[in-house]
Amino acid sequence: MMKSVFFGVVAITVAILSIYQETAQAQEQTVGATDNYQWDSVDDQCLAALHRQINKEFDASIIYLKYAAYFAQEKINLPGFEKFFFHSAAEEREHGIKLIEYALMRGKAPVDKHFKLNYDHEVPTVTTGESALETALQKEVEVTKSIRGVIKACEDGSNDFHLADYLTGEYLDEQHKGQRELAEKIATLKKMKKSAPKLGEFLFDKNHM
C-alpha cells in the first residue's frame, strides 16, 4: 500500500511538472501574439501566491496519505481513520487540480520552477487518532491562512476580483466547515477516551469516522 501511495504521488508530480514545461513553452511561442491582447494578464505577485497555494494543496494531500496508510496497517487496523484520511487526501488533491485548471484557464502555467512536493512530514511509528486529527486541523488552518494570503495578494496587486471571488466561494467555505468538523471530532474523541481509556479510540473509529 505504501508503494502504491508513493508511486501515485510521484505520478502527480511528473504530470504537474510536464504541464508546467508545456505551458511555459507555449507562452514563449505566443508572446508576440499576446503583447497587444492581454487576455492572460495576471499580476506577478498574485500568480506567485497561486503557485504556492497549488503546492500547499498537494503537500496536504501527501500528509493525509501518510496517515491513511498508517491507520490501514494490519497492526493498527483503524478503518474509520483510514477512510477519513484517504478521503481527505483525495479532497486536497482535487483542490490542487482545480487550481491548476484555473491557472490554465487564465492562460498561465500552473506551477513555476519552485514547485516541489514536501515529503519531510513523518508519521510517528506509534501515533494516536487524536494526534492525527490535531495535525490535520493544524494543516487545514495553515491552508486557510494561505488561501487568504492569495486573495489579499490578488486584490491588492491588481484588483483581480475574479480569482479572489473564486477562492472565497470555492475554497474558504469548505475550509471553515472542514475545520469545524475536525474540531468537533477531536472534542468527541477526547471525551470518549476520558470515559473509556482503553476502548475510547476503538469506539470512536467505529462510530464517528
From Swiss-Prot:
EC number of this enzyme: 1.16.3.1
Quaternary structure, from the entry: Oligomer of 24 subunits. There are two types of subunits: L (light) chain and H (heavy) chain. The functional molecule forms a roughly spherical shell with a diameter of 12 nm and contains a central cavity into which the insoluble mineral iron core is deposited.
Main localization, broad class: secreted
Lineage, broadest ranks: Eukaryota, Metazoa, Ecdysozoa, Arthropoda, Hexapoda
Matching Pfam families: Ferritin
Enzyme class, spelled out: oxidoreductase
Subcellular locations according to the entry: Secreted; Cytoplasm
Residues bound to Fe cation 1: 57, 92, 95
Protein name, UniProt field: Ferritin heavy chain
Residues in the signal sequence: 1-27
Keywords: Cytoplasm, Iron, Iron storage, Metal-binding, Oxidoreductase, Secreted, Signal
Species of the source: Aedes aegypti
Gene: FERH
